[in-house]
Amino acid sequence: MAKEKFERNKPHVNIGTIGHVDHGKTSLTAAITKVLAKTGGATFLAYDQIDKAPEERERGITISTAHVEYQTKNRHYAHVDCPGHADYVKNMITGAAQMDGAILVVSAADGPMPQTREHILLARQVGVPYIVVFLNKVDMLDDPELRELVEMEVRDLLKKYEFPGDSIPIIPGSALKALEGDTSDIGEGAILKLMAAVDEYIPTPQRATDKPFLMPVEDVFSIAGRGTVATGRVERGKIKVGEEVEIVGIRPTQKTVITGVEMFRKLLDEGMAGDNIGALLRGLKREDLERGQVLANWGSINPHTKFKAQVYVLSKEEGGRHTPFFKGYRPQFYFRTTDVTGTVKLPDNVEMVMPGDNIAIEVELITPVAMEKELPFAIREGGRTVGAGVVADIIA
């Protein structure tokens, strides 16, 4: 059977379910597909079809993730759901599933639990910009005052991690009832209300082509009679012949002008996000730049050496370290196209970090790298990946 063409007639948004184990993330995902299937916006997927998500490898890390797609009247969604807590941690830190927004599922019967807190913290650290809350299992609560209490607790927790707790939509309902075909306010009605809140509250993300231009340099050539060419894949934005760019990272920042853009040996008017291009640079010699630097719009990104990060350390089974590391650990940090050595500083109350841990650290690199919040990186020892991380904050 021929593959259906992906219709781009609606804006596309990436979302996912987050929250404590057994609070109903996967049941909610199944319920959304069931309810939207009625209007032709989804194919119904039962709980066990979502729960047995296949394992994937992202930057050397094994992650189980279920990918579900559906659409509302206004939008097309790609939705990720992870079976296990460790999968969420890895997924969010590696950026394997970039989320434009998340649905936080909280059981009304239990209230916020340790993983509720951890997922909200991770969402804050890795830059998930918006959260909508589904207060699940409300059929198990008779007392409306208790429900209000849980709601207040959730709002306070969100505020603690700098989300706008007072204005975030909280939709009460029961994913199980919706799956059983209950058409009341807490069943199907709640799912429709949730999707309306997601449609309205989570903005359509800015497309990569609309952001300021950035291209990591993979290679540098000199072409006789033409000059110096930097090759790489455009990460975001667009670049036209005649535009001025900065070369950022590793060495002092330099400015230059793009005098040509080539792709597959053909000249282009402009290169855009996703294109593998060669950019001809005015007035530069082959030795003036190197792999690991980036070409970028003036002033759009700066070089830094000190940052805070959230990292996941690979377990021994994933091919990571067999032993813990301590403060002063000096691995290589792989950003975009290059490794830079850096020293790790651990939080005050942490003596050592075990393989399989998820931890907030501070890093100081020996050379500056073009960096911004939410930039993912790998931690390597002698070319072998031992961890993955994301920049949570820039210090210097």
From Swiss-Prot:
Subcellular localization: Cytoplasm
MF-aspect GO terms: GTP binding; GTPase activity; translation elongation factor activity
Top EC class for this record: hydrolase
Region G2, annotated ranges: 60-64
EC number: 3.6.5.3
Chain positions covered by the region annotation G3: 81-84
Region: G5, residue numbers: 174-176
InterPro entries for the chain: EF-Tu_GTP-bd, EF-Tu_GTPase, EFTu-like_2, EFTU_2, G_TR_CS, P-loop_NTPase, Small_GTP-bd, T_Tr_GTP-bd_dom
Catalytic reactions of this protein: GTP + H2O = GDP + phosphate + H(+)
Chain sites annotated for binding Mg(2+): T26
Keywords recorded for this protein, A-Z: Cytoplasm, Elongation factor, GTP-binding, Hydrolase, Magnesium, Metal-binding, Nucleotide-binding, Protein biosynthesis
SUPFAM superfamilies given in the database record: EF-Tu/eEF-1alpha/eIF2-gamma C-terminal domain (SSF50465), P-loop containing nucleoside triphosphate hydrolases (SSF52540), Translation proteins (SSF50447)
Annotated CDD domains: EF_Tu (cd01884), EFTU_II (cd03697), EFTU_III (cd03707)
Family classification: Belongs to the TRAFAC class translation factor GTPase superfamily. Classic translation factor GTPase family. EF-Tu/EF-1A subfamily.
Annotated PANTHER family: ELONGATION FACTOR TU, MITOCHONDRIAL, ELONGATION FACTOR TU-RELATED
Quaternary structure, from the entry: Monomer.
Record's protein name: Elongation factor Tu
Gene from which the chain derives: tuf
